[in-house]
A protein has these predicted regions:
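Residue-level detector of buried hydrophobic side-chain packing
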Residues: 73-74, 102, 203, 325, ...
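Internal active-site segments that recognize and position negatively charged phosphoryl groups
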Residues: 321-332
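Short secondary-structure subsegments characteristic of cysteine-rich extracellular domains
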Residues: 90-109, 217-233, 337, 346-354
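Residues that define the transmembrane beta-barrel architecture of outer-membrane proteins
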Residues: 68, 216-222, 255-259, 301-307, ...
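Outer membrane beta-barrel translocator domains of Type V secretion systems
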Residues: 155-323, 432-434, 439, 452
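Solvent-exposed, glycine/polar-rich loop segments of beta-barrel outer-membrane systems
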Residues: 246, 250-253, 284-301, 333-354, ...
Length: 455
């Protein structure tokens, strides 16, 4: 039987096949992956260029896989081999020296090389193909001769449409840690209130931008809260927060809408000591899109919670200068989630226990004379994430799987400046600007502005 496969046409083999003459050219595909069983193809003569073989392999076994035998080939014969290796489905990484015979060309004129394969699963796979006299075993000996072609390695990388699925949880974590507040950032200088034992309401707006780990995003948020002053040394209250971010990934993007609520208590000592405790619960709604060869999308919701404990002491001089060392621990939990994309990819992200410590110092000055007292300061902090890794499992409809973990342990620094201004009655305005350095996610800038009304 004579057969022609050309002009991007495809021959779906469903069993062992033998042809007398095979013309294979101009992007034609011989698909040996149409059947789950390993198959053999025997061709008497072979002509053409630009042809593609799609073959099933089990490189780790060094024996199981589709086989092609060619008795004679034209002098200019060359072929491209794409593989679907069993390691794509088992999640097992093929290690060490491996050689799997795929093609035998008796004339020795045929030439083959690997071609990358992405069929919309999880992986982009490029096989390394070598002649038998160039493929070596563990002792350095050739495993075949120049008429044979061996698969020696399967190079896998995450395909373009899977990258956003991996990066989206990283963005959620980055937003969680960027949202960590200190007392002064959230409320300004609490001791700058006009009436120390009077309740009030406050509002704060913040905007920022960050990048890192393949993510670039702008974000903004708004907080509204109520203070209940039990006396001139203690204040408790509650607040609500709404935040939005628009991260960009390689070959994708998302829209994140967060909603959270919290309660807090703050206590002041006679010697400038303060303690601030904040408990917070939130959710994050994700609208995720990819836009490469196999565009995909997913919508899902995650939850998080945190408990922050902050201590500080203000040392004040007669000329208004002050120094304020601070220590803070934030314990948090980012919830687990299972979801399925529009193309049927399933994603499981495990929960994550976070523990972020911060050591900081402020240096500033208070000016208390006049109708509108104010203060200003410089600040610097070192932060460290003590939490470990977060686990993930992905699976595609074609059977490809992926298991990995993301280690969020990190150390970084933050620096900024800010101040408070009492501008009349029982109203105070406060603001600051900051950025971070040295971490996996860099806060390029963030500014905060807030106002406190007492009544």
């Amino acid at each position: 039987m004579d057969l022609t496969v050309s002009d991007r046409g495809m021959w779906n083999m469903t069993g062992d096949s033998e042809v007398t003459s095979l013309e294979h050219s101009r992007g034609g595909v011989i698909n040996m992956n149409a059947s789950p069983a390993y198959e053999t193809l025997h061709s008497g003569s072979y002509t053409g260029n630009g042809r593609i073989f799609l073959m099933k392999t089990d490189l780790d076994s060094e024996k199981d896989g589709d086989k092609v035998t060619i008795d004679s080939a034209a002098d200019d014969f060359s072929g491209l081999i794409m593989v679907k290796d069993s390691s794509l489905y088992t999640g097992k990484e093929v290690k060490g020296i491996r050689n799997l015979l795929l093609v035998t060309g008796a004339s020795g004129k045929a030439r083959f090389e690997g071609k990358d394969l992405d069929q919309g699963g999880l992986w982009d796979v490029t096989p390394v193909i070598k002649r038998g006299n160039e493929a070596l075993d563990a002792e350095g000996n050739a495993v075949g001769d120049h008429t044979e072609w061996y698969l020696t390695k399967v190079e896998k990388k995450v395909n373009k449409d899977t990258i956003p699925l991996i990066k989206a949880p990283d963005n959620s974590y980055a937003l969680y840690r960027l949202d960590i507040d200190s007392l002064r950032k959230r409320m300004g200088d609490f001791r700058f209130r006009n009436l120390k034992d009077t309740s009030g309401i406050w509002a704060r707006d913040f905007h920022g931008s960050y990048d890192g780990q393949g993510i670039n995003s702008k974000y903004n948020g708004f907080q509204l809260g109520y203070d209940n002053a039990a006396n001139d040394k203690s204040v408790d209250g509650f607040f609500a927060e709404r935040n939005i971010s628009s991260p960009k990934y390689s070959y994708g993007s998302s829209e994140n809408h967060g909603l959270s609520a919290g309660v807090y208590g703050t206590w002041f000592g006679d010697s400038g000591v303060y303690t601030n405790v904040v408990a917070k619960w939130g959710r994050d709604d994700m609208e995720l899109k990819s836009w490469s060869n196999y565009p995909d999308r997913a919508d899902y919701r995650t939850h998080n919670e945190s408990l922050s404990v902050e201590f500080g002491k203000t040392f004040t001089k007669d000329n208004g200068l002050f120094l304020e060392p601070e220590a803070q621990m934030v314990f948090g939990y980012l919830g687990s989630k299972n979801y399925t994309t529009c193309r049927g990819k399933t994603v499981h992200m495990g929960g994550y226990d976070s523990a972020i410590g911060r050591l900081g110092i402020l240096f500033g000055k208070r000016v208390t004379e006049g109708e509108h007292p104010y203060n200003y300061y410089l600040k610097f902090s070192v932060l460290h994430e003590f939490g470990g890794s977060r686990s993930f499992h992905l699976a595609a409809l074609d059977g490809e799987t992926m298991d990995y973990s993301e280690d969020y342990q990190d150390t970084w620094e933050e620096a900024g400046f800010g101040g408070s201004w009492h501008f009349g009655g029982n109203t105070s305005l406060y603001a600051d600007v900051e950025r971070s350095f040295g971490g996996n996610w860099n806060k390029k800038w963030q500014w905060n502005i807030g106002v406190n009304w007492q009544f």
